[in-house]
Amino acid sequence: MGSGPLSGIKIVEFAGIGPGPFCASLLSDMGADIVRIDRKGAKGGSKYDIGSRGRRSVALDLKKPESVEACLKLIEKADILQEGFRPGVMERLGLGPDVCLKRNPKLVYGRMTGWGQTG
C-alpha cells in the first residue's frame, strides 16, 4: 500500500484498455491499493504492461464459478470496483452491480466506457 491521499483505499480493477487502466494508474499513484483482475491465459499480462504500474494482479477465468467467487471475496473487502467492459458483460459474468452491492453495500461501483452503457 502506498502513501498519499488515497492510502488505505482498496480497489478491484477489471483489466481493460484505454481509460480504465490509466485511471487506475493515477489512483495507484495517489496511494490506493489496487488488485487488477486479468484474463487467465492472456498474452503478456500486466507484468509487461506499463499501464498497470503500482498494482498487484491476479489472472482468473471469469467464466468459472470459482473465479467469480474469488472476485466476490476481493470485492467484499474493497472500497471501489472499476470496470470498463461493454454494457452487460459484468452482469453476464455474475459480477454486476446488484450482485456486488449485496456482498458489499458500501462499494463504489465504477463503470468507464467510451460510449456509455447504452451507446
Regions found by a protein language model. Give the residues of each.
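N-terminal helix-loop segment corresponding to the beta1-alpha1 unit
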Residues: 1-119
